Curated annotation (Swiss-Prot):
Signal peptide: none
Keyword rRNA processing: yes
Species for this entry: Haloarcula marismortui (strain ATCC 43049 / DSM 3752 / JCM 8966 / VKM B-1809) (Halobacterium marismortui)
Functional summary from the UniProt entry: Involved in pre-rRNA and tRNA processing. Utilizes the methyl donor S-adenosyl-L-methionine to catalyze the site-specific 2'-hydroxyl methylation of ribose moieties in rRNA and tRNA. Site specificity is provided by a guide RNA that base pairs with the substrate. Methylation occurs at a characteristic distance from the sequence involved in base pairing with the guide RNA.
Protein name as it appears in the record: Fibrillarin-like rRNA/tRNA 2'-O-methyltransferase
Pfam family, one: Fibrillarin
Amino acid sequence: MTLPSGVERHDFGGETSLATQGQPVYGERTDGDWRRWDPHRSKLGAMLAHGMDTGLGGGETVLYLGAAAGTTVSHVADFGGPTYAVEFAPRPVRELLDAAESRRNLFPLLKDARKPESYAHVVEPVDVVVQDVATRGQARVATLNKQFLTDDGRLLAAIKARSEDVTADPDAVFDSVRAELSAEYELLETARLDPYHEDHLGIVARPRKD
C-alpha cells in the first residue's frame, strides 16, 4: 500500500509509526516537525497501519464525520486539502477549534452528522467522507452523507459494533452494516481493526453509480 503524500513512517523512541507534519494536538510524540499518528487513538490511523487501500493520495477535499476533539482529523488536515470537521458535542468542539488554529484548511462545524441538510450550504463536493461517528445507525450516517461525495470519491468508515448493539455478536453487526451500506456503496475492502481497536471494522467503499 502506498501512503498518502504527506504521511511518512518515522522512528519515535525506537518505535516506527506513521506521522504527519503539523502542530501537536493530543500529546503525541514528535520528531522535529513530524508528529506520531497513534493508531490506538485513531481508527483511520489503524486502517492505514493495517495496510488498507484507502485511496488517499494527499490533497483531497474531506468531510470528516465525528471529529470529536480533533485527534484524527488534525492528521487528515495535515496532508489533505479543505477538511470539514463535523462534531455534535460542544465540549470537544472547543478542542477542535484549538487544533484548527494552526490549520487554515480545517473547518470545524458544530453540527449533527445525522442531519446533513444543516451543513449542506457550507460543504462543497468532497473526495472523501470519513465516517467516525460512534452511535447507533452508523451505516445510515454514511448513506445520508453520500450526497457530498464526488462520483469517484471514497467512503472510509470505522464501524464500532458496541455502538450498534452492545449485546450482539460483532460479526453479526458487521454483516448487517455491510448489507445496509451495499445498497448505496460498492464495498472495496473491509478489515477488523484489532489490536488497535477491539470490535471495530474498517470499510473502504465508493458510491454506487445510479
